[in-house]
Every structure is written in C-alpha cells, then in structure tokens.
Curated annotation (Swiss-Prot):
Main location: membrane
Lineage: Eukaryota, Metazoa, Chordata, Craniata, Vertebrata
Signal peptide (UniProt feature, chain positions): 1-20
A Gene Ontology cellular-component term: membrane
Keyword annotations: Glycoprotein, Membrane, Signal, Transmembrane, Transmembrane helix
Organism: Rattus norvegicus (Rat)
Name the UniProt record assigns to this protein: Transmembrane protein 158
C-alpha cells in the first residue's frame, strides 16, 4: 500500500529540475530550447548591459548641439550694385548652409540662391535686382552643424547593441544631419548707407584721375591762347625793315646847329637833312 501511495505522489507532484542539469544547457539535450523563456532571460540581462554601456560611453556629439541656440549674429554689407558680403559668428557651427531668397513677390521668390558648406565671410555676386528699381526685400538664413564627417568608434571598443537596423553609409545630407537655422530679413534699399558699399565713397583712383584730367585741360587751354600770338605778330609791320632801308642809304651829316637856336629850329634842320638824304638816294643815275 505504501509503495503505491509513493508512486501516486511522485506522479502527481513532479520535482523541479536541479540547477546545472540538462534544462540549463539546451545544447546538451536534444530538445530545442523554450523561445519565450530564452527571450525573456536574454532581455532581462541585455537591457541593463545596454543602459550601462550607454551611461559609461561618452556621447558622440558633444554639447554644442545640446546648448541653447545662440542669437543670430549675421551682418550683411553691400559691396557693389549686385553683390553682398555676408558675415556670421563662428559659434554657430563649423560648416554652414546659406539660403537667400526674396520675400516681397507674394509667395513666389523672384530671386533665390543656396550655398552648401561655406564659411564666413561669403561674397554673393550677381544678385538679382527687381525691375524698375522697385523695393526688394530679402531673407537670409544660415544653418550650421558641428559634424565634419562620420564619427567612427575606435577599434576594439565595446559598442552597444543597436535597437534598430543600422543605416547604410552614405553622404551626410542623406543621413539627416541636424542644422540650426537663423534668419535675417533686410531690404536692399536699407543697405545703401552701409560704409562697405563702394558706390557711396570715392576711391583714391578716381580722385587722382580727376585731378590729372583737370591739369590737362588747363594746360591745353593756356596753349590755345598763346600759340596764335607769333602768327598774328608776323602780319604786323616790323621796324627792322625800316632800319635796314635807312642804313643802306648814304648817311648824311646833320647840319650844324648853332648854340643859340631853339628846339623848333633844330627839329626843322633835322627834317631838312633827312629829306635831302632821301632825295639823293632816289634820284636816277
């Protein structure tokens, strides 16, 4: 009777498996392991390991992205009629994307330009201007990031198990690189008073050219007034010809004038002597 009761109790209440037996080592027994139990067991041990590795490993992207966004530090200067010089602060990031487009065309950009991975300062040339000199409002947006390239873990370093399938390697613009954009609204008419616009100030070259041309005009004006003088003087009667004619005639001795004669008498005597000399030179031989 007792052996029968012992057999019934053993059949009704099976003993739990001992540790280290075939149940703990599914590879040693021919039966496949329990999938649900194995998954729960693995999950219980892998979750703390993931948390520990994530807490111990330093973040791949340092604090500049987690810091609050810096205020917009963007300045725009007008260099020429259709060019702009843009500057922004380095704390916004290492590599920046710049967008420039017009905003006063009722939802349609009259002019738009994009620059990828540029640094300050940036010169934007061939700026589209509105027809008829109309007011043109523009918006400038600068977005910067702190990633220079794909960050790779050092060889042999333990890595956490990914919770999702890893993305295939590719360009950063395909990986959704974060950008912090900061925009500035301005008008081209407001930039005309900027000191950087060269059209509002006279360069030294223009001043020198103006001075040189003024000097040339003055010299030519003086020369134009002087050069006709010798030509006009050639048509005037020359006193040298009369002197040569008088020297070629025989010199007549002037008559002696008494000391007591007056000036009128002396002049009359001189005129008579001159007439006699002319008459003697013209008389036929």
């Amino acid at each position: 009777m007792l052996p029968l009761l012992a057999a019934l109790l053993a059949a009704a209440c099976p003993l739990p498996p001992a540790r280290g037996g075939a149940t703990d080592a599914p590879g040693l027994s021919g039966t496949p392991p329990n999938a649900s139990a194995n998954a729960s067991f693995t999950g219980e041990h892998s979750t703390p390991r993931l948390l520990a590795s994530a807490a111990s490993a330093p973040p791949e992207r340092a604090g500049p992205e987690e810091a609050p966004a810096a205020p917009c530090n963007i300045s725009v200067q007008r260099q020429m009629l259709s060019s702009l010089l843009v500057r922004w602060g380095r704390p916004r990031g290492l590599q920046c994307d710049l967008l420039l487009f017009s905003t006063n065309a009722h939802g349609r950009a009259f002019f738009a330009a994009a620059f990828h991975r540029v640094g300050p300062p940036l010169l934007i040339e061939h700026l589209g201007l509105a027809a008829g000199g109309a007011q043109q409002d523009l918006r400038l947006c600068v977005g910067c990031g702190w990633v220079r390239g794909r960050l790779r873990a050092p060889a042999g370093a333990p890595t956490a198990l990914p919770a999702y399938p890893a993305a295939e390697p590719g360009p950063l613009w395909l990986q959704g690189e974060p950008r912090h954009f900061c925009c500035l609204d301005f008008s081209l008419e407001e930039l005309q008073g900027e000191p950087g616009w060269r059209l509002n100030r006279k360069p030294i070259e223009s001043t020198l050219v103006a001075c040189f041309m003024t000097l040339v005009i003055v010299v030519w004006s003086v020369a134009a007034l002087i050069w006709p003088v010798p030509i006009i003087a050639g048509f005037l009667p020359n006193g040298m010809e009369q002197r040569r004619t008088t020297a070629g005639a025989p010199a007549a001795a002037p008559a002696a004038v008494p000391a007591g004669t007056t000036a009128a008498a002396a002049a009359a005597a001189a005129a008579a002597a001159a007439a006699a000399a002319v008459t003697s030179g013209v008389a036929p031989k």
